[in-house]
Design a protein with these regions (language model features):
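Short beta-strand scaffold segments in enzyme catalytic cores
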Residues: 257-262, 308-312
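Basic nucleic-acid-binding interfaces
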Residues: 267-448
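Active-site lining segments that contact anionic ligands and/or coordinate catalytic metals
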Residues: 175, 233, 254-259, 359-361, ...
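Conserved hydrophobic/aromatic beta-strand scaffold that supports enzyme active sites
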Residues: 140, 152, 257-259, 281, ...
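Low-complexity, intrinsically disordered Gly/Pro/Thr-rich segments
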Residues: 236-249, 418-430
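Conserved, well-ordered active-site substructure
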Residues: 197, 246-261
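Short glycine/threonine-rich loop-to-helix capping motif typified by GTGT followed
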Residues: 191-194, 251, 369-373
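Active-site histidine-anchored catalytic micro-motif
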Residues: 2-248, 266, 275
Length: 448
């Protein structure tokens, strides 16, 4: 029978009820205004570990960076400081899985066995039993990654080199994500905490490896990780920072929070290069149908999940447009399939012919994840819309339609934009927009 570490702080640091937890994750992740679509994802995150009421928004900003990692990251190496049980070195559990209200996460016993070959890595279920620093990250990871295995380390008294050695051993490839759990300064007055934390953020961004526990409670795992990251020449990006006085606490004694994303060299693909590749995939897919087999185009970043629209024009007029609103296929596959559908299966147009093909031009739009809009009434909805930036999905009574941001070029009035979108969805002219579900997204587009 499998042994499972039960969730220790569900109901305290985050909701114990699965439905309530999912709703809170929706709120935290949905509260990040629809970001631009991402190509690639971080190798590592640094995230805080207080209750979601306090540090949840800062943590969510980091986990939002994993939007393209689902289906690629299969293992998470998670390190955080011990708060309850003293440990010499790094402690790993012996149980088979960690539980959260969202389900069980299997442990990667091969990875943990490899780490235990090092003399400073010990087995201790007790060190993990009540530890919150690791547990609070798990629901975010489950939401963003889906299925993955976990290699958790409760870090006690260890040197920079000892922590770095463990991280190096489990570094892996794109299938492995490293997460470091740490808060910043503790129990300082608000102004003093801001001063201390600003200096600490600068030191983290410069890969300092001598942070102390007054600067970051997780200084021990963080220092070791920064040493490994510096050796591998990762780039680092500060995503968010605040303290409990900015969220749900008073300003007399506060705790600081920050989140960082770190990228391996070459992981952040240039938009220009990505656009050339996606347009080439779209054109090759259509030409393969028109003229025969074409050479396949592949790259690791094309295997991430992606949602795209492919638009065909001829002599400046629309010739076909088909796309995906959710990232359910690999990016390369999604572009190719949508290109074929736009050329041959758009019901508004006849199939593209070889004779007209030389005059057809392509546009590929890469969509961010759609975020639900929250509004009090129709006027509030209209006030929030951003012409030229927002792609909009309108849903009501089982009907749905979308307009890409490009449509603002021809319909620049907000109310008319939504009315035309409702009409596209097959809704009556008098439908009350405030009763519709409205989501928005952003796109990055490339045109031949």
């Amino acid at each position: 029978m499998a042994s499972v570490r039960a969730a220790a702080v569900a109901g305290m640091f985050y909701p114990a009820d699965p439905r309530s937890l999912n709703a809170e994750l929706d709120e935290l992740l949905g509260g990040i205004d629809a970001p631009a679509p991402r190509l690639g994802f971080p190798k590592a995150l640094v995230v805080p570990h207080a209750g979601y009421l306090y540090s949840g928004p800062v943590a969510a900003r980091a986990f939002e960076e994993l939007g393209a990692a689902r289906g690629i990251v299969r293992r998470v190496v998670l390190l955080g400081p011990v708060h309850r049980v003293p440990v010499r070195g790094l402690a790993v559990p012996t149980v088979d899985a960690f539980a959260t209200p969202l389900g069980n996460i299997a442990l990667d016993h091969a990875a943990l066995a490899s780490a235990r070959e090092l003399p400073h890595v010990v087995a201790s279920d007790l060190a993990h039993l009540q530890e919150h620093a690791l547990e609070v990250q798990l629901p975010f990871l489950q939401r963003q990654l889906g299925e993955f295995s976990l290699a958790p380390f409760a870090v006690g008294d260890a040197t920079v080199a000892e922590v770095a050695q463990v991280i190096e051993r489990l570094w892996g490839g794109p299938e492995t994500l490293i997460v470091i759990s740490t808060d910043l300064s503790h129990y300082q007055p608000y102004a003093r905490a801001c001063e201390i934390d600003r200096a600490t953020l600068t030191r983290i961004a410069s890969f300092a490896t001598n942070l102390d526990h007054h600067e970051a409670c997780g200084a021990t795992p963080l220092n070791g990780f920064l040493a490994a990251a510096r050796e591998r020449r990762l780039s680092i990006k500060l995503l968010a920072a605040c303290n409990s006085g900015d969220t749900a606490g008073g300003k007399g004694q506060v705790v600081g929070y920050s989140s960082f994303a770190l990228y391996e060299p070459g992981a952040e693909l240039s938009l220009e290069e990505a656009g050339r590749t996606l347009l080439a995939i779209a054109r090759a897919a259509i030409e393969a149908r028109l003229f025969g087999a074409a050479q396949a185009i592949d790259a690791p970043w094309l295997r991430q999940a992606g949602a795209t629209f492919v638009t065909l024009t001829r002599d400046g007029a629309l010739r076909g447009c088909i796309g995906s609103l959710q990232a359910e296929r690999s990016l390369g596959t999604d572009v190719a399939e949508n290109a074929i559908a736009a050329a041959f299966r758009d019901p508004r147009f006849p199939a593209v012919t070889p004779a007209e093909w030389p005059g057809v031009r392509l546009e590929v739009s890469l969509l961010s994840a759609a975020k639900p809009m929250r509004f009090a009434d129709e006027e509030d909805l209209l006030a929030q819309l951003r012409p030229g930036e927002d792609g909009v999905i309108l849903e009501h009574e089982g009907r749905r339609a979308t307009y890409l941001p490009q449509v603002w070029e021809s319909i620049n009035d907000k109310r008319q934009f939504l009315r035309e979108l409702a009409r596209k969805a097959g809704l009556p002219d008098g439908v009350r927009l405030a009763r519709c579900t409205i989501l928005r997204y952003r796109v990055t587009k490339w045109t031949e």
